[in-house]
């Protein structure tokens, strides 16, 4: 008997409307993956996709239909006996062979039907996917004439030149000429039937549970798997620039085509041909590179493709000038050699040779590690990578920023294969990155004497440089540093207040501007979680000053759920995929709008609803907040949020605009009051205001006195010890006294 039903039978409460069910209806990112990972969709596009799927069905044999019926029954019978699942699998060799044969028939005999242009437009526009050809108009226009008006080929050249010179295209016509509507991907099953990817790769994708493609996968996978037709009518792989929201599946989008291309290459090449690095994936941080390798290993299982993470001491290319240096190394001192050379010397003595060159097909690396490997720690000219046919820049806007630009371009230029294809991926990409990519591709084309022309396409999902619309944004004024600390503690220990208050459940990330501030905030919060819940072990800090082992251990514990709150810098702001994070706290405002987009993108991954992004700002931050407020406003409009907005119009009007000079200064150094290298007395006073601590000045003075006394005592002891050692050394032995 339900006591709640019995007590509320005279009320108007609906059945099942219990408090527990009301609370459970609020879905969080940590509760599991979303039913549909797509961010943008409507009923018209879904109808078109359903029609496309129905049009591709073909007649199946009776045995195949019976086998499918058995599989469906086994899947739907969640509470059935274990024997049902075992009986559905083939037991004899003949049944297994027939199943493999039928699987091949499904891929080869299935009638492939393509959408018409109206259907393609409907689907791409509904999912807010925009594909643009970035080549010069002189290269685009002949393609249009050849494909749309084949009858006009018979005209004379002079008449065609006159017609083209008479009417110059307007900006609107130029945009229309550049706009493309390629075939979208309806489901992951099409990868095998329509694009003929490896059967083993298709099985690995299915085992990971991928069924519905996200917007970026829906648009990019057909292009990268040969779905773009060139001027001659043949399918080619274009150079691609992709701008897609955080957590939308960009890693899977570039891994599948790269792996499939290598599988085909291994199948076509002779066994005698030497294997080497076929594709390079460059990422800005070690955490992101390690994550890409982990995802890649799941996809390459059983395909014969090897993926490796770049490490110190790894040799990626055979250099001709290494032999001469190897002979002289025994006579020279080894102080100037790198860590990799130290690791290789014992091997060289034992086996009379060097460490073997890596045979991995895909190499995932950070820029500096690969540059050091190719240039012997920048002591020799860069070696070339003639076998590399794909270079992928993940988080391309950072890799082509001044910090990594020279290293990234050196790697790009070292790939000398004439058929090299480049793809750049990020959630934020400025026009300067596009211009740099275009100029680099053009420069390579001239350097390699490339005769064949490849298209350069840009694919944008949603609004460019905007935050994901499936999370809630909160911009909170805290006035002072103590106000921010108080607000953060209220998140950790929520009280029974109004429903409008922010409630954030662990796990979540806290971002700070600098490493000292992250360490100070961690030491301030480490005892805020009671010992019954795990105490200080539930809070950790992660930054670049930690060793690689410490960083990987913290990441592992955070993914396992042993750490609930992770205080970090912008080290984890990009690319790292924590699927169950319920929210992000910007304790310090980000240095730019792009950094805000990437920070808040750590939650709401793969379409998960319920994520929260909280940003605290103080009086010192007011000049820099408007760009963040604009992003939040655009995100809410994109979401279609009704009712009261978190960013009011009066706030947008009141916040001051930031000049270009101030934007550059903020991007380089952050808010001046929080910089750790302040020197003047005036700046030091501002720095004291932004100190993360709840200790009073009196307590801090006592601590400083204790530290000074301890340091003075140590100095006095060391001086006395050194004086005693000096006196004993100066004394001479006069012999034994009588």
Curated annotation (Swiss-Prot):
GO terms for cellular component: cytosol; nucleolus. ATP binds at residues 244-251. A motif (Q motif) lies at residues 190-218. It catalyses: ATP + H2O = ADP + phosphate + H(+). Keywords: ATP-binding, Helicase, Hydrolase, Nucleotide-binding, Nucleus, Ribosome biogenesis, RNA-binding, rRNA processing. Coiled coil: none annotated. Its main location: nucleus. SMART domains: DEXDc, HELICc. It is an enzyme of class 3 (hydrolase). It comes from the Eukaryota. GO terms for molecular function: ATP binding; ATP hydrolysis activity; RNA binding; RNA helicase activity. Residues 319-338 have a biased composition (Acidic residues). A motif (DEAD box) lies at residues 394-397. InterPro entries: DDX52/Rok1_DEADc, DEAD/DEAH_box_helicase_dom, DEAD_box_RNA_helicase, Helicase_ATP-bd, Helicase_C-like, P-loop_NTPase. Its EC number is 3.6.4.13. Residues 231-447 form the Helicase ATP-binding domain. GO terms for biological process: maturation of SSU-rRNA. CDD domains: DEADc_DDX52, SF2_C_DEAD. Residues 487-655 form the Helicase C-terminal domain. Residues 17-29 have a biased composition (Polar residues). Residues 92-104, 697-706 have a biased composition (Basic and acidic residues). ATP-dependent RNA helicase involved in 40S ribosomal subunit biogenesis. Required for the processing and cleavage of 35S pre-rRNA at sites A0, A1, and A2, leading to mature 18S rRNA. Interacts with the U3 snoRNA and is associated with the 90S and 40S pre-ribosomes. The Q motif is unique to and characteristic of the DEAD box family of RNA helicases and controls ATP binding and hydrolysis. Belongs to the DEAD box helicase family. DDX52/ROK1 subfamily. This is ATP-dependent RNA helicase rok1. It comes from Aspergillus clavatus (strain ATCC 1007 / CBS 513.65 / DSM 816 / NCTC 3887 / NRRL 1 / QM 1276 / 107). The lineage of its organism: Eukaryota, Fungi, Dikarya, Ascomycota, Pezizomycotina. The gene is rok1.
């Amino acid at each position: 008997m339900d006591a709640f039903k019995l007590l509320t039978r005279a009320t108007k409460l609906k059945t099942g409307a219990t408090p527990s069910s009301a609370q459970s209806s609020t879905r969080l990112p940590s509760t599991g993956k979303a039913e549909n990972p797509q961010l943008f969709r409507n009923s018209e596009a879904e109808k078109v996709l359903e029609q496309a799927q129905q049009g591709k069905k073909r007649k199946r044999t009776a045995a195949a239909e019976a086998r499918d019926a058995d599989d469906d029954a086994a899947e739907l019978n969640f509470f059935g006996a274990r024997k049902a699942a075992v009986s559905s699998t083939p037991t004899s060799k003949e049944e297994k062979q027939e199943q493999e044969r039928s699987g091949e028939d499904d891929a080869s005999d299935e009638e492939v039907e393509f959408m018409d242009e109206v259907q393609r437009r409907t689907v791409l526009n509904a999912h807010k996917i925009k594909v643009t050809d970035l080549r010069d108009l002189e290269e685009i226009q002949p393609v249009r004439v050849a494909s749309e008006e084949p009858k006009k080929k018979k005209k004379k050249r002079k008449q065609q030149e006159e017609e083209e010179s008479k009417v110059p295209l307007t900006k609107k016509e130029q945009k229309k000429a550049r706009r493309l509507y390629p075939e979208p991907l309806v489901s992951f099953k099409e990868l095998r039937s329509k694009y003929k990817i490896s059967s083993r790769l298709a099985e690995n994708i299915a085992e990971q549970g991928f069924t519905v493609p996200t917007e970026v996968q829906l648009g990019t996978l057909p292009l990268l798997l040969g779905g773009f037709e060139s001027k001659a009518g043949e399918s080619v792989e274009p150079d691609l620039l992709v701008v897609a929201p955080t957590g939308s599946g960009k890693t899977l989008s570039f891994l599948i085509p790269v792996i499939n291309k290598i599988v085909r290459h291994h199948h076509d090449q002779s066994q005698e041909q030497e294997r080497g690095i076929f594709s390079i994936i460059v990422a800005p941080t070690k955490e992101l590179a390690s994550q890409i390798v982990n995802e890649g290993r799941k996809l390459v299982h059983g395909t014969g493709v090897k993926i490796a993470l770049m490490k110190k001491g790894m040799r990626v290319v055979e250099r001709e000038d290494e032999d001469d240096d190897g002979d002289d190394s025994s006579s020279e001192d080894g102080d100037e050699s790198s860590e990799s050379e130290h690791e290789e010397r014992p091997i060289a003595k034992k086996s009379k040779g060097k460490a073997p060159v890596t045979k991995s097909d895909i190499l995932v690396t950070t820029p500096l590690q690969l540059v050091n490997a190719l240039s012997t720690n920048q002591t020799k000219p860069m070696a070339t990578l003639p076998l590399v046919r794909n270079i992928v820049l993940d988080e391309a806007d950072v890799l082509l920023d001044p910090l990594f630009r020279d290293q990234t371009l050196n790697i790009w230029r070292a790939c000398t294969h004439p058929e090299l294809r480049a793809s750049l991926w990020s959630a934020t990409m400025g026009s300067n990155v596009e211009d740099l990519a275009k100029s680099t591709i053009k420069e390579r084309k001239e350097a390699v004497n490339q005769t064949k022309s490849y298209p350069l396409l840009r694919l944008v999902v949603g609004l460019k440089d905007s935050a994901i619309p499936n999370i809630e944004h909160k911009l909170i004024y805290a006035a002072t540093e103590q106000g921010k600390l108080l607000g953060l503690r209220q998140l950790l220990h929520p009280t029974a207040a109004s429903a409008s208050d922010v409630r954030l459940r662990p796990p979540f990330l806290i971002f700070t501007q600098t490493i000292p501030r992250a360490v100070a905030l961690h030491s301030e919060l480490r005892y805020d979680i009671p010992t019954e819940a795990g105490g200080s072990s539930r809070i950790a800090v992660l930054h670049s000053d930690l060793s690689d082992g410490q960083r990987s251990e913290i990441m592992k514990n955070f993914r396992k759920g042993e750490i609930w709150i992770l205080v970090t810098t912008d080290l984890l702001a990009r690319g790292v995929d924590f699927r169950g994070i319920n929210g992000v706290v910007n304790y310090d405002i980000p240095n730019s709008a792009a950094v805000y987009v990437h920070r808040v993108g750590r939650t709401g991954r793969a379409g998960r609803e319920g994520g929260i992004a909280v940003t605290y700002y103080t009086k010192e931050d007011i000049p820099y907040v408007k760009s963040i407020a604009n992003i939040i406003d655009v995100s809410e409009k994109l979401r279609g949020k009704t009712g009261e907005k978190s960013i009011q119009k009066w706030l947008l009007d009141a916040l001051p605009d930031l000049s270009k000079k101030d934007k550059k200064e903020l991007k380089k150094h952050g808010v001046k009051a929080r910089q750790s290298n302040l020197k003047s007395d005036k700046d030091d006073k501002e720095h004291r205001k932004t100190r993360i601590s709840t200790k009073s000045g009196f307590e801090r003075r006592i601590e400083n006195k204790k530290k000074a006394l301890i340091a003075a005592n140590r100095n006095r002891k060391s001086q006395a010890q050194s004086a005693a050692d000096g006196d004993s050394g100066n004394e001479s032995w006069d012999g034994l006294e009588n």
